[in-house]
Every structure is written in structure tokens, then in C-alpha cells.
Amino acid sequence: MRIEEDIKLGFKDVLIRPKRSILKSRSQVNLARCFSFKYSASIWSGIPIIAANMDTIGTFEMVKSLSKFNILTAVHKYYSFEEWKNFVCLSSKEILNHVIVSIGTSNIDFLKIKKIFLLSSELKYICIDVANGYSEHIVSFLKLVRDYFPDKIICAGNVVTGEMVEELILSGADIVKVGIGPGSVCTTRVKTGVGYPQLSAIIECADAAHGLNGQIISDGGCTVSGDIAKAFGGGADFVMLGGMLSGHKECSGDIIEEKSKKYMIFYGMSSVSAMQRYEGKIAGYRASEGKTVKIPFRGGVDSTIRDILGGLRSSCTYVGAEKLKELTKRTTFIRVTEQENCIFNAFKE
């Protein structure tokens, strides 16, 4: 047993210090990024936000909406091959270029993804997704996928420490997904006592990844656009969103009406709801590590995306970053004990 004495930080623990700027308007800020990758020869350009590969968020409908903003969607792994086939046949090149195909680490997953990628050469991205990226099994599976798909852009996770980021990159990942327990409907930290505050995880993992010409995705913990700015400021190359995109018509799930108000169900992928839906039961050796919540229906996702992007542009303006790429080097974090004046929060409409 050992104790690390330095305090690790989450988004609520800091603010970004404003700096002198020559920008006259938020409209001058360019949020697009362009990345090359360690293994894949592909070049990616777009706004580096990703819809999470949760079954309620990473849907084909979400792909169609977010592709208009040049934003990626990590499509969840529970679609059948036939559903993939129908989607690919009916989708344009522009839409398919914004799809990340998510898989688990079983032999069935591997066989399925091989079939999916035969459907179109426009599919370029793979996300190997498990809750615990510290398993030797994900490393061996990653090597298998990299050998079979040498030209695809592969991300793998989730981890929260630099040494495992390095392990995954050296084993074939172009991008590593960072985050254990910060999600809005995740209870892993309280159920297991395991986790890492997200901002510190980003800072440490970005340093490890960039030293090997890799990238990271910050996965989880963002509740407002300011948190997304902090993630980019801390060194994240991409930011993955789940809860912030929930409750929209592009999400899967029924709309529930109660007392003339509409709601949607949103749940974590290790929750009772998810396990009962896909496995039929909770295995005797497992515990739920997720919540199920009922959230107000918010209509189409477009207005939410515009609000997020507007907040990001404003963040860049406050520190003088003309491009999102410049935000990290323009960011100075200050430790704080407060974030906002909450006096009227109870009166929000």
C-alpha cells in the first residue's frame, strides 16, 4: 500500500485565467483541428468532439445530426450487422466519414467488425471499449485488431494513468480513451472506490500520449461547455460527451409524458437497465455501476451543439486563442473553491 500525497483535480476545482487577447469577436475563433496519427496514414479534420458510444447516445440518428457540424459519433456496439448494413447502404460518404465503430473484446466482436468494415471503405475509425483498460486482455486484443486493420484509426480505453496510455499506444492504439468513473450516470467510483479526477487524468495522460505521437480522448465528467474548454485546455485532443447530449430526439429510447411534460430515460452502460437489456439479468458475480435517470426531453440536438460550440469559442476568446489548437498553450488553471453564483439556480425555467 502507498499514498500519493499530491491532490488530483477535477473540472470543478479550477477555472481558466483570462489573458490579453487581440480577438475582436468570437466569430474569429476556429474550432476545427487536423490530426495525423501514429499508425494510420489517414488525416482527420473536424471539430474534436465525439458523441459517446452509449446505446442511448451513439445512434445512427446522432451520426446524421452531428456530421453536419463535422463532429464524430462513436456508434454503440449493440447494433446488429443487418442494422449496420442498412445504415451504410443508405448513408453518404460525408456521413460515414463521421462514424466510429465501437466494439468489445470478444471473438464475436472481432468477427462482427470484420464484416462491418467490408461494407464500405469510408469507415475509418474503430473504438475498442471496455470499462477497465488495465486488463492484459485488451492489450492482446488491440494487437490483434491492429494487425488486421493496419490502416484504420484505432482508439482504446478506458485508462487514467500515463503508463497504461503508453502501453496501449505501443500496442497499436492511435488514440487512448481517458476516464474511469466521471460520467453523469456512472457510479464506479462510489461502488468500487476506484477512479481518478478527470482533469488530472487528462493532464497526465496527454503528456504520456503526446510523447509517443499519440492522442487522447477525455471521456466523461463534462457538465457544461466550460468543462469541455478545461478538458481541451488540459491537453485533451478530443472530448467525448454522453450526458450533455442525452434527452434529444436523436437518442434511442421512448419519450415518456407525465403531467404534460416529456422525458427520456438515460442510463449508464454498467447499470441495472443496461445489463437487463443486453444480458437479460445481472450476473451473480457483478454489481451495478451505473444510474438510471429520467431527464426532460430537449428536442433536436442541433441547438445544444450550437450552445456548446458558442461556449468553446467564448473560452478561446477570453484567453486569446484564435484556434482551438492554441487553447492548451494559452491555458493557465487557477485553483478555486467556487465556480458560480448559485443564488437563483432554484428559479431556473
Swiss-Prot record:
Catalysed reaction, written as an equation: IMP + NH4(+) + NADP(+) = GMP + NADPH + 2 H(+)
InterPro entries for the chain: Aldolase_TIM, GMP_reductase, GMPR, IMP_DH/GMP_Rdtase_CS, IMP_DH_GMPRt
Root EC class: oxidoreductase
EC number, UniProt record: 1.7.1.7
Pfam families, alphabetized: IMPDH (PF00478)
Chain positions recorded as K(+) binding sites: G181, G183
Classification via SMART domains: IMPDH
Molecular function GO labels: GMP reductase activity; metal ion binding
Binding residues annotated for NADP(+), in chain numbering: 108-131, 216-239
Keywords noted in UniProt: Metal-binding, NADP, Oxidoreductase, Potassium
Active-site residues (renumbered): C186
Record GO biological process: purine nucleotide metabolic process
GO cellular component assignments: cytosol; GMP reductase complex
Function: Catalyzes the irreversible NADPH-dependent deamination of GMP to IMP. It functions in the conversion of nucleobase, nucleoside and nucleotide derivatives of G to A nucleotides, and in maintaining the intracellular balance of A and G nucleotides.
Family, as annotated: Belongs to the IMPDH/GMPR family. GuaC type 1 subfamily.
Record text on subunit structure and interactions: Homotetramer.
Name recorded for this polypeptide: GMP reductase
Organism the protein comes from: Buchnera aphidicola subsp. Acyrthosiphon pisum (strain APS) (Acyrthosiphon pisum symbiotic bacterium)
Gene: guaC
